[in-house]
A protein has these predicted regions:
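Short, well-ordered alpha-helical microsegments
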Residues: 13-14, 34-36, 64, 86, ...
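Short, surface-exposed amphipathic charged segments that create phosphate/polyanion-binding patches used
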Residues: 19-25, 43, 61-67, 111, ...
Length: 191
């Protein structure tokens, strides 16, 4: 089966999975942690691709527990791509937008945030009276909660891509033909 036959975006993953009959076996990828989370909220037992986001894999359960002891009133916000042991500590599991909206509407003043650190700027901008503490990685010598791949995107690159329509991505005609149906179906299901 072509990879294009089953791709979904994170925020739509549960909605897409729920659209299939419960007795239909599904293969979920590329993120096993997101797949585990979807399994837990849907009661499914999907087969999971053994891939994961390097940022969400590196949060330390022990260090988050230590932070929680320092800030006992803090709520722990966790992205569903985090390991299951981290997710079990969560007061709220949600997408980037879901975590931001939760923080805006919460009466809590302190939050421990277990996701890519780029969200912290927006959280602090929208909630200047609240304290957002990045969840620590297992390795204290690195900036492991920053995604190097996301940092490759810049406004200048986006501008040039829109203006000059480059870089051009070439897709094999047969792959494009096979991919168009699930992409359209995914968009229909996510409305």
């Amino acid at each position: 089966m072509s990879r294009g036959l089953g791709d979904v975006y994170k925020r739509q993953a549960r909605q897409i999975v729920d659209s299939f009959p419960k007795d239909q076996q599904l293969i979920f990828g590329p993120d096993k942690n997101l797949g585990n989370y979807i399994n837990s909220v849907t009661g499914r037992n999907m087969l999971l691709w053994n891939g994961a986001c390097h940022v969400h894999e590196k949060f330390s359960v022990e260090k988050i527990i230590e932070l929680k002891q320092q800030y006992p009133d803090a709520e722990i916000l966790v992205h569903p791509e985090c390991k299951g042991a981290v997710a079990k500590l969560a007061d709220k599991i949600g997408s980037t937008a879901g975590l931001l909206n939760y923080a805006i509407n919460s009466t809590s003043k302190n939050f421990i945030v277990a996701t890519e650190s780029g969200i912290l700027y927006e959280m602090r901008r929208k909630c200047p009276d609240k304290n957002f503490i990045p969840a620590p990685p297992e390795d204290s010598t690195c900036a492991c909660n920053e995604c190097n791949f996301m940092r490759l995107n810049t406004l200048e690159k986006l501008y040039n891509t829109l203006k000059y329509e480059w870089p051009e991505v070439q897709v094999d005609a047969e792959i494009a033909r096979q991919a168009i149906k699930p992409i359209r179906r995914m968009l229909e299901l996510s409305k």
